[in-house]
Amino acid sequence: MPVCGCLSVVLSHAVVLLMLVLHSASGHPQTFPCRLIQRVALCSGRQLSVIPDCLPHETEEIFFDRNLLENLQDGLSRYPFLRMFSCANNQLMTVAETAFIESHLLENLNLANNELHHGHKQVAQAFRSLTQLKTLDLSGNGLSEDMVSVLVANLSSLESLYLSRNGMQRLDESTFRDLHQLKELNVERNLLFEISGAFDHMKKLQRLNLAFNCLPCLVNFEMTQLLVLNASHNSIEWFITNQNLTETFQLETLDLSDNHLLFFPFLPTNNQIRTLLLSNNRVGFYQHLANSTSSNWTTSVDYYNLGQNISNITMDLWNENLHGNLSSVEFLDLSENKVNYFPQGFIKQMPQLYWLKLRSNCLQSFSLTSEDLPVTIYELDVSRNRLTEIKASQTSKNKLNNLTHLNLSTNDLQNFPPMIFTSLPNLNTLDLSHNTVDVCYSSNYMGLSGCVEWSSMASLKQLYLADCSIQNVPSSAFKGTSLTHLELSNNPNLHLKQQSLKGLANTLQHLGIGNTGLQDFDFSPYTNLKSLNISRNSLSKLPDSLMALNLKLLDLRDNSLTTIKSEHASLLAKKLQTVYMNGNAFNCCHLDWFRTFGENKGIHVADLSEITCLDLNYRRHKVVLTDAVYCGFTNNNKESVVWYILLFVTVSVSIMGISVIYMLTFKPRMLPRVIKKKCWRPTSY
């Protein structure tokens, strides 16, 4: 009995202790698997396979991306105030029909990058409860057009729908038949080759993205309410709007870049297009072909609607007056096309044009006059053409007051009117690189062919003259300018004198004189210089004047430097942010500068992995892998001698041992005879 009594007492105490432990545990705050910020639960990337059931009842937003959810059951029913649920990048294949039955307020649903093609019909049943849904993202789910049609069949409240990276091929009027409120639709990166009538009933659609598909043409376009159309990266050869519509098209941005356009698009007669992107096509103008007398020459093309046999269109191929209204265009990008001329007055049809990009075409001449360019032009890029001539008149250039950026690089320009740029009062940036340009001497520039006058251009800040075959820069060349960037690299015969940059000491911030044969130049006056390129100049040592500058970027590539003085390295390491040094002949035994740069975390050696050095045997090694062994006897001289002695003794003993073994093995009688001859002596007894 005493034993039983003691046992009962012990058990009672244990029960009391257990209750205390449980009570204390319940007093601690519960640990959530998500991070909570007000009414937002951040549960992304937590390796979760179910929706947490311990979140606050009033949670409005749940981010559940990058988890392991495969089947969405009733986990959201605990959160009736939910307005946004993001479940992208999971493994979701099915959604229970009752998954959203309590989510009456849900407006934004993101299910991108899952596997919903497995159970799309069940998912569609679940969507029936989402009567307030405004935004839906089903991108990257392997959906066909039929699956999409089922999924969105009852989502009449949708305003934004994202279906990129799926497997849709053909869209028609039934695909989105119930989406009358849709304002934005993204179907990029599918396999679409036909979209006939798919969007005609969407009277509120404003943004349509068709990029990265296989569309062959867009004909009889009449979506007047659309603001932005992106049809880039397709196979479009024709873009033709319905010319019979009198209603004004609201389209502001049209992107047809990276297609197969042969002709300038046939735009609406009444439109508000501001941005027109046509780069990387095959656009050209063909007025010269209109008068061809060949019997087989076609002058018109007919388009037929094979589906309904109505709305047939006939267009004159060579009529250059069918471009529609261009009066509102502000940005025109025709880069990388086949344009070799512009029809008379074509660019002047755009009186609001600010940006004109004509890079990589076939233009041979260009007119820099207000008769051919709108006075609003702000940036003009005619680089990488075949220009041999720039037309200008002294009276008209003064009217291009808004022109600020001009790029004429990589052409075949040789002859310039000397004062061609001085009358552009607001020209800020000019690039003439990769042409044949000379700098005029103020005293006789009028007699030179191809030279350009730069002095007194107060607005000019950035001037690029790389690879222009310049040989001399006179002392008065940049007088009256306030250049901050001057690029003269790749003029190997340039004779740059100290007075050549006279007047730029207080303004110059970037100077490029790589591959100019530079030898002696005093950089100390240019106290505001931040970036300097002196690469490919065969420099054997750094100019001392560099140490007076507060440089942030220095390019020393492809010179003849063998080392950098310790004091120079210390100064540069404190000031520089980025340095390029590859292509020099650094000595592997004089790399103190390398260690100095490595110890200073503020400097970034951009090409560190490529820098090499030469050892005593002229073998090349990566600087980052260099060992002192390449320098011969240095501080470890005594230790190296000991190793050589030990090696010699070891070899000698080995040879002697081998000799003895040979004698004992092959001539055993010779050894006793030799020993007897050498060692035996007559005794006295």
UniProtKB/Swiss-Prot annotation:
Domain LRRNT intervals: 29-56
Family annotation (SMART domains): LRR_BAC, LRR_TYP
GO biological process, one term: microglia development
Subcellular location: Cell membrane; Endoplasmic reticulum membrane
Intervals, Extracellular compartment: 28-640
Annotated LRRCT domain residues: 597-635
Signal peptide residues on this chain, from the entry's feature table: 1-27
A single Gene Ontology CC term: extracellular matrix
Chain ranges on the Cytoplasmic side, renumbered to this chain: 662-685
Functional description taken from the UniProt entry: Key regulator of transforming growth factor beta-1 (TGFB1) specifically required for microglia function in the nervous system. Required for activation of latent TGF-beta-1 in macrophages and microglia: associates specifically via disulfide bonds with the Latency-associated peptide (LAP), which is the regulatory chain of TGFB1, and regulates integrin-dependent activation of TGF-beta-1.
The name this protein goes by in its record: Transforming growth factor beta activator LRRC33
Provenance organism: Danio rerio
